Regions:
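Conserved nucleotide-sugar phosphate-binding/catalytic loop shared by glycosyltransferases and other
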Residues: 5-9, 31-79
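A short, glycine/small-residue-rich beta-strand->loop->alpha-helix junction that serves as a flexible
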Residues: 6-19
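A generic structural motif
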Residues: 27-33, 89
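Short, polar loop motifs at secondary-structure junctions
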Residues: 35-41, 97-101, 152-158
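Active-site regions of enzymes building and remodeling cell-envelope glycoconjugates
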Residues: 43-55, 110-113, 160-170
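Short, well-structured alpha-helical segments in soluble
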Residues: 77-90
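Conserved nucleotide-sugar donor-interacting segment of glycosyltransferase catalytic cores
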Residues: 91-138
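A nucleotide-sugar donor-handling region in carbohydrate enzymes
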Residues: 124-172
Length: 172
C-alpha cells in the first residue's frame, strides 16, 4: 500500500505527532510526506517528499486567527496550483493531519482520505464547545480539510473515533 501523509507545518503539534506516527505507518506501508506551511519550530527529523506553502493562518496577539493578516499573506493561486499538481493519484490512501493540499487534492481526484488531527476532535459534535463561537473559525475548521473519515486526538477520548493525544517519546 502507498500512503501520502499530509502534515500541517504551521504548528509544532502536527510535526511532533508525525514524528511518532510515521515510524508506525512505515512498518505497514510505503509512505511519502507532504509538509505544508513553514511555521513549525521543530525539525521534522524525517524525509519530506513534497513541500507547499499551503494555506497558512497568521496568529493574533490574543492567540486566535488574524483573518485580515492571513488574507493579505495568502496566495490562493499557489494553493490551487499545489492542489492540482500534487501527484495524489499514485497513492492508495491520503492521511492528513489537518493539511489542506493533500486532502483537497484527494477529494478532487477521488483518492480516499482520512483526517487524523486534533482539529477533527475539536470539530466533533460531542466536543466541548466555548460559550461564544467564532463563526469564521468554525467555518474554517469544518472546511479546511475535506476528508470524509475523521479520527481526532483530544485530552479525553469522548467518542469512538477520538483518541488521547500522541505524546512525543522525549516528553513521556
Amino acid at each position: 500500500m502507498k500512503i501520502l501523509y499530509g502534515i500541517q507545518g504551521t504548528g509544532n503539534g502536527h510535526v511532533a505527532r508525525a514524528r511518532e506516527i510515521l515510524p508506525i505507518l512505515n512498518k505497514y506501508a510505503d509512505v511519502d510526506v507532504i509538509l505544508s506551511g513553514n511555521q513549525s519550530q521543530i525539525d521534522p527529523g524525517f524525509h519530506v517528499n513534497y513541500r507547499s506553502e499551503g494555506l497558512t493562518f497568521k496568529s493574533s496577539k490574543k492567540g486566535g486567527i488574524a483573518y485580515m493578516k492571513s488574507i493579505l499573506t495568502a496566495s490562493p493561486i499557489d494553493l490551487i496550483r499545489d492542489i492540482r499538481q500534487l501527484p495524489v493519484k499514485k497513492y492508495d490512501l491520503v492521511i492528513s493531519d489537518f493539511e489542506p493540499v493533500s486532502s483537497w487534492s484527494a477529494l478532487i481526484n477521488g483518492v480516499p482520505c482520512v483526517d487524523m488531527s486534533h482539529q477533527a476532535a475539536v470539530n466533533h459534535e460531542l466536543s466541548p464547545k466555548p460559550q461564544s463561537i467564532d463563526r469564521m473559525g468554525a467555518y474554517v475548521l469544518s472546511h479546511y480539510n475535506p476528508a470524509k473519515k475523521k479520527y481526532g486526538f483530544h485530552f479525553e477520548a469522548f467518542a469512538e473515533n477520538i483518541f488521547i493525544p500522541v505524546i512525543r517519546k522525549e516528553v513521556r
